Amino acid sequence: GVTILTSLNSYQTKKYYNNQNVNQLVKKFAINAKKNNLDGIVCSPLEISTVRKEVGNKMLIVVPGIRLEKKQINKKDDQKRILTPKQAINLGADYLVIGRPIVESNNPLKTIKEINKSIIEK
């Protein structure tokens, strides 16, 4: 199941979803996903805790909106609700979707190695 697109900010979410805030909607979608026995759910890194609280460890959490550091974010980047790989994993993400930071990198292999290193570091 999918919750709210990571490209939507709180204003847009309220506009499109009848004045409900992101966490209310994500909670509702997580409960619905659990009730329907889905294997996993896609959510922004900022909602991992909300989803995990509702679904426990019985569902996988897949997380897009992963960025390396705020200073590296392109101004044209449409992702609004983001965290680093390490932050998302620490919150309970099972899988990370890391596209643009790698694809748009001048050296994708180096970027992947940096991501791995950042996850392992304490």
What are these regions (language model features)?
Residues 70-94, 110-111:
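Catalytic cores of alpha/beta
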Residues 42, 96-97:
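Conserved beta-strand positions in the central sheet of alpha/beta enzyme cores
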Residues 30, 48, 85-86, 112:
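Generic hydrophobic/aromatic pocket-lining and core-packing "Φ" positions
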Residues 48-49, 53-56, 83, 117-120:
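N-terminal amphipathic alpha-helix/helix-capping segment at the start of soluble metabolic enzymes
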Residues 33, 51, 88, 99, ...:
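Conserved, mostly hydrophobic/aromatic
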Residues 89-91, 101-122:
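C-terminal helical cap(s) of enzyme catalytic domains, especially alpha/beta-barrels
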Residues 1-40, 44-48, 54-62, 67-74:
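Conserved anion-binding
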